[in-house]
Amino acid sequence: LEQHGLSGALRGFKKAIQRMNAIEYDRSQPRPRVLIVGEYLLNFHPGANHEIERYLEKNGFEIIEARMTDVIRKTYFCQDEQIRTYHLKKPFVKKKWYHVANRVFDAAHAAADRIAKQHPLYTPVCRLPELVKESDPIIPHTFDAGEGVLIPGEILHHAEHGCRAFVILQPFGCLPNHVVGRGIVKKMREMYPDAQILPLDYDPDVSFANLENRLQMLIMNVKERCVDTVALPDAGQRSPVETMNRKQKNADNKKQKVS
């Protein structure tokens, strides 16, 4: 993008999709899906979240990730919606800027969608204006503190499309995200009683073992309750969790024999 501009970025994206089309995949046994949402630095930085995506993938999940562009766009969109909904008086230039910014995001997403549709597994995502309005039963879509309505909006949208496992990442002591993260869990569970919603607090002293214990509870609950209505391993197959535990047990037995 820096060297070749927008046209170069689009060409690079097309090449990436072409290379992905050459990768073989097997969808005969769909994995249960889990949505990861929360504070955006934790959400998108593997070092900060202890590579939670890789861990859940190793344990048999298909990851649904939130979109970084929605985090950037949220402020422009919410300001524009607040002006329209509450009839706020703002300078004309500022009103126009919010409107233009939203149009630019729409154009960029449309261009990316046209290219990404060349991959057979690509599903166009819900655009921000429709996504955030999913949260209205819980939090008005004009709310803009912390991650705003992105967390409830994402969860409700994917819950309506069959996902039943959700992980909310939040820094310990981040009050706005505790309101729109942990604070919405009770209402979410009332709306979707079979949903597994796990808020995870991160701080500098938290160990991965602590996080792993809570993640394993989510993994086992998904396996036992068969959430997400997909074919989980039957009695004749070992689940990824069982396989991992069996490998660890064999390794421990070998160590004991050597000693």
Feature locations, PLM:
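An N-terminal assembly and electron-transfer interface module characteristic of large anaerobic redox
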Residues: 1-259
